């Protein structure tokens, strides 16, 4: 199938992917722009996995204070080069992720950051809530509830507040695919007036 330049341009504007990647995705999806976006998102996740081991020593720390002055967030986002760290897209994503932390109160950056004892404690609570169910059903329910816990407690697993069709990790993977660099949120701290650390 021959893909028009207008369609390639539209997909590029939507995703920020390269011309050739957009053309290939549109050919693979037979001109369906929604499928092409999904293809590019999957490619972004694959690219992110390849780049995950690379050192991220550059980056920025952003501060967000909610308009009422009662909630504040400091967030560090890293990349490989200062060139990427200075781009508007990188800075905007970091700032929006600080807003995400302010609004959604994650406790961890990634699911790998959740201590094993916290996971075991959550599992105990879930098992106690459903102890009357058959054993083979209990494990499936516990896994489902644990997945929900990760979606609430881990920044990367949360639904993005500005686009509920994506998770935070999808946005980071898209930026990794676009820049060709490893990008990650290293840490954040959320403050709320009246809350103890």
From Swiss-Prot:
**Which GO cellular component terms are attached?**
cytoplasm
Per UniProt, the keywords (alphabetical) are: Cytoplasm, Elongation factor, Protein biosynthesis
| Keyword check for Cell inner membrane | no
Where does this chain mainly localize? cytoplasm
Q: Does the keyword Protein biosynthesis apply?
A: yes
One Pfam family of this protein, by short name?
EF_TS
**Region annotated Involved in Mg(2+) ion dislocation from EF-Tu, chain positions:** 81-84
The protein's location, in the record's own words, is:
Cytoplasm
GO molecular function: any one?
A: translation elongation factor activity
Q: Which family does it belong to?
A: Belongs to the EF-Ts family.
HAMAP family per record: EF_Ts
UniProt cross-references to PANTHER family, sorted A to Z? ELONGATION FACTOR TS, ELONGATION FACTOR TS, MITOCHONDRIAL
Query: In UniProt terms, what function does this protein have?
Result: Associates with the EF-Tu.GDP complex and induces the exchange of GDP to GTP. It remains bound to the aminoacyl-tRNA.EF-Tu.GTP complex up to the GTP hydrolysis stage on the ribosome.
Please report the name of this protein according to its UniProt entry: Elongation factor Ts
What is the species listed in this Swiss-Prot or TrEMBL entry?
A: Thermotoga neapolitana (strain ATCC 49049 / DSM 4359 / NBRC 107923 / NS-E)
Quick one: which gene encodes this? tsf
């Amino acid at each position: 199938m021959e893909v028009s330049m207008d369609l390639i341009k539209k997909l590029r504007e939507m995703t920020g992917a390269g011309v050739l990647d957009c053309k290939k995705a549109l050919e693979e999806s037979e001109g369906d722009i929604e499928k092409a976006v999904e293809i590019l998102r999957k490619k972004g996740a694959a690219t992110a996995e390849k780049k995950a081991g690379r050192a991220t020593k550059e980056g920025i720390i952003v501060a967000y204070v909610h308009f009422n002055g009662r909630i504040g967030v400091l967030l560090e986002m890293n990349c490989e080069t200062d060139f990427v760290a200075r781009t508007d897209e990188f800075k905007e994503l970091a700032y929006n992720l600080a807003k995400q932390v302010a609004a959604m109160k994650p406790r961890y950056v990634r699911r790998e950051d959740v201590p094993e004892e916290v996971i075991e404690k959550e599992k105990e609570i879930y098992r106690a809530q459903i102890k009357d169910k058959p054993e083979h059903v209990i494990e499936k329910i516990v896994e489902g509830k644990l997945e929900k816990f990760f979606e609430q407690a881990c920044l990367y697993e949360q639904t993005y507040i500005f686009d509920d069709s994506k998770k935070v990790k999808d946005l980071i993977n898209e930026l990794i695919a676009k820049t060709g660099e490893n990008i990650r949120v290293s840490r954040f701290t959320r403050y709320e007036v009246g809350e103890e650390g």
